[in-house]
């Protein structure tokens, strides 16, 4: 998907025309219109939003902020997931339901209990998580799915960084 210059749904549909299955993605809504696709959300994106909302300064011994609690829920999921790496996809699927589903249920319950200011960093994190909820548990459906799309993003990073560097190169050799 990284080869497309635009995020128009038509370009995604043309690229994925006969594909049926799971697509790991960030919060881009264009994937929602594709038929035969199960969108798998990225917990690293939700975690990042909560990290961005953590206050820069906090008194020693102060209770955890809501942003820290949100980040900690995400960290717990990643910690559990790390322990499941060596399992077969079938066993990973079973263990996720056993170990991660209760954490997810607690996270969503906690998230719904929050009242936040929409424009604040915490408000943005909470709104993003709430909006992505329909896709965030889809990784539980198949042990081959990942909890994040970090691997894909790391694979395309050289091209996304290079895109600006190559902007004024007139030939591939000049780039």
Model-derived segments and their meaning:
Residues 1-175:
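Catalytic center-proximal scaffold of phosphoryl-transfer enzymes
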């Amino acid at each position: 998907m990284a080869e497309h210059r635009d995020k128009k749904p038509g370009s995604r549909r043309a690229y994925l025309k006969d594909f049926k299955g799971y697509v790991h993605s960030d919060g881009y809504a264009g994937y929602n219109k594709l038929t035969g696709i199960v969108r798998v959300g990225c917990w690293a994106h939700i975690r990042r939003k909560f990290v961005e909302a953590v206050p820069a300064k906090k008194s020693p011994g102060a209770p955890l902020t809501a942003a820290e609690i949100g980040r900690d829920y995400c960290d717990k999921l990643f910690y559990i997931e790390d322990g499941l790496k060596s399992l077969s996809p079938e066993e990973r699927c079973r263990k996720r339901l056993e170990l991660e589903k209760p954490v997810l249920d607690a996270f969503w319950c906690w998230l719904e209990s929050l009242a936040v200011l929409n424009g604040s960093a915490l408000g943005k994190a909470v709104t993003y998580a709430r909006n992505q909820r329909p896709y965030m548990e889809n990784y539980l459906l198949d042990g081959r799915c990942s909890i994040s799309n970090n691997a894909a993003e790391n694979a395309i990073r050289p091209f996304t960084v290079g895109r600006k560097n190559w902007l004024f190169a007139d030939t591939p050799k000049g780039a």
